[in-house]
Amino acid sequence: MLKTTTVAGLAAVLLTTGLPAEVAQSFAEAVRVQAPAVPSFANVVDAVSPAVVSVRVQARERVSDDESNFTFDFGGRGFEDLPEDHPLRRFFREFAPRENDRADRWRDRRGPRGEGRLRPRAQGSGFFITEDGYLVTNNHVVSDGSAFTVIMNDGTELDAKLVGKDSRTDLAVLKVDDKRKFTYVSFADDEKVRVGDWVVAVGNPFGLGGTVTAGIISARGRDIGSGPYDDYLQVDAAVNRGNSGGPTFNLSGEVVGINTAIFSPSGGNVGIAFAIPASVAKDVVDSLIKDGTVSRGWLGVQIQPVTKDIAESLGLSEANGALVVEPQAGSPGEKAGIKNGDVVTALNGEPVKDPRDLARRVAALRPGSTAEVTLWRSGKSETVNLEIGTLPSDAKEPAPATGEAQPDEGQAGEEALADLGLTVTPSEDGKGVTIASVDPDSDAGDRGLKEGEKIVSVNNQEVKSADDVLKVINNAKKDGRSKALFQIEAQEGSRFVALPITQG
């Protein structure tokens, strides 16, 4: 009977798997994760809520001369055709002088002209980071304000003053001067933050007062186009207007991010919010408390990403680094000899991933310090040492190229670069060649080249004619390259474009 049962069991295995039992048992099992119990956030909320505040911002509206000189003396405006003995004329002659005297007295009480009353300007959130009253919020919450009020979670209202603000990271620090010791929170080590971690957002959405929402970290390192230092955490906790400047906590009650922006077609929460990481906020906040401003390192070069095509055209094995489009005149980069077409591949020995990575790391360097910059130039690696400058407060991108000739159809001197889908003509200023026409079905058309733009160099060699372009391309073919790197100047600025080159 035991033997019969064993055979039956084996038959069942063969029927369900189609394979012998010993083979079936050797397959790896599907991934199984022990599901944790859904946590309660109540303990975290109880601990951190006293440190989170609402921030009310007011601005003193300037009163114009017309407003401060308001008068009841209509001077007969609108009543010019009334007879002299008309009752309305008599009314204004008797009434207006008395009212003007009253208006003058109110102006005297208000003080000098130009100082209007305080008007509500913005409302957001913030949180204490020291027991003596320093608190963090967003720059865009306080930037237009002249008076600031902090509202505690128990309803207490306290005046605050602006310590410093930084528009590039959208952070600001306020200070409440009070004898009490405030409950405060600390920043987390956000290197330990993982996608999928639970987080709790606390703030003041729509001015409702302290509100708690929960979610997870959806992504890290988000670039939302707000500036060169974008490195946001994306969270799906409900964040709305008024949450700006409020904290996002981990389950240990540490601040992992500062709520700054939401993605929303309608203006309401759709589960996509962005928070400044704690590591970025901590450095900026420390500088604002110490100096009232933030000093950043500056290289002074305009850069763009290294695409796979660009990497291939330059002989780079990987599409990493930052391609230098234009060093700014007098900048540390220009003084150190960094040129158009160089690729910054490492900074102080650490590889550079992309332009955003380079911008953040340079900004974090102390002005006046020495940095080692590794470049890829003319097919080989070079290193330059330079002194990091101080980012000017009004630093802008280099001015766009100007003076391009705008060709007409059939312009004399046009030469065809048929394999590229281009015709070009020598530029009027002798610098490069101007694109006269672009085949919309060509690689050049696909990559956005346009009539009137200028080809300044090919593979970092200056060109002044179609023959120059062809010469550089032929040399690239001899070197086994399948792409050539074109430097393009347009009204919007300078950029590099890699175009395929036909072998043969």
Swiss-Prot record:
Gene Ontology terms describing biological process: proteolysis
GO molecular function: serine-type endopeptidase activity
Region ranges (Serine protease): 113-286
Residues of the active site: 140 (charge relay system), 170 (charge relay system), 244 (charge relay system)
Residue spans of biased composition, Basic and acidic residues class: 102-118
Subcellular location(s) of the protein: Periplasm
Signal peptide location: 1-26
Principal place of residence: periplasm
A Pfam family per the record: Trypsin_2
Catalyzed reactions per annotation: Acts on substrates that are at least partially unfolded. The cleavage site P1 residue is normally between a pair of hydrophobic residues, such as Val-|-Val
InterPro entries: PDZ, PDZ_sf, Pept_S1C_Do, Peptidase_S1_PA, Peptidase_S1C
Binding site for substrate: 242-244, 299-303
Record domain PDZ: where: 287-378, 401-491
Entry-linked SUPFAM superfamilies: PDZ domain-like, Trypsin-like serine proteases
Entry keywords, A to Z: Hydrolase, Periplasm, Protease, Repeat, Serine protease, Signal, Stress response
This protein's GO CC annotations: outer membrane-bounded periplasmic space
Function as written in the Swiss-Prot or TrEMBL entry: Might be efficient in the degradation of transiently denatured and unfolded proteins which accumulate in the periplasm following stress conditions.
The family this protein is said to belong to: Belongs to the peptidase S1C family.
Protein name per Swiss-Prot or TrEMBL: Probable periplasmic serine endoprotease DegP-like
Lineage: Bacteria, Pseudomonadati, Pseudomonadota, Alphaproteobacteria, Hyphomicrobiales
